[in-house]
Amino acid sequence: MKIETIKYRKERKMRLIIVRHGDPNYEIDSLTEKGWREAEFLSVRMEKQLQKEHTYIYTSPLGRAKDTAYLTLKKLGMTATEFKWLREFEAPAIDEDTGTYKVCWDLLPARWTSEPAYYDKDQWMNTPFMKKAKADTESAWVYDGLDSLLKKHGYTRENGYYRAEHANRDTIVLFCHFGVECVMLGHLLGISPVVLWHGTAAAPSSVTTLYTEERREGIASFRMQSFGDLSHLYAADEPASFAARFCETYDNMAERHD
């Protein structure tokens, strides 16, 4: 397999890179054989793209995220800091439509689209389902964790933007999970995570990149340059995993149903 066809440039700018773990084996909280291949192709990309001396890597405490990070860390000769708030977003509740426990990102379209609050960045956690799931407490924990990390790197949250108290060109890499990724993106971009959970799919090993913009001195915001990028898989002729998606047509029993 050829995995050098895409040339990645090592850039010096303030970046926040969010990496979803490789194809998961949830039974053992690790990766499938395919997931390990994805992690290897990802590590080749990361080695080419990152400057070790300006890169800081953080991981979820869950095995599938740490295993995905392992090969990148090995190639770079680095270690990662583990944060509990980077674990998968835990806010399940009984779904009225099915009578079973559902995670926040698996609600049926007819359910979540009928409640205007789900589209609101400040009200999405106040719907009956999200209240039962205690999504307000869980999301506040993630918001606080992310803001504390960014403050450590020189950016302090103020209203909907960040004060650039020490503007810099660090690269922050977070190895984590789709659910918590959307919560962080919602916080940074001012979007309800419910819209992101149900309207996007960051496939396993995908890379999402955000940059800071400081158009006025001391006032910074984040802009997403790419979401769910899989160029490292395309370069290696490795197909994307179907994980995080449901059946494209109801009659296709080979694809995920609920």
Show the residue positions of the predicted features:
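Short regulatory "switch" loops immediately downstream of catalytic or recognition motifs
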Residues: 1, 50, 147-160, 211-215
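A structural signal for well-ordered alpha-helical segments within the folded catalytic domains
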Residues: 40, 63-67, 140, 144, ...
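GST-like fold's C-terminal all-alpha helical module
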Residues: 143-166, 170-178
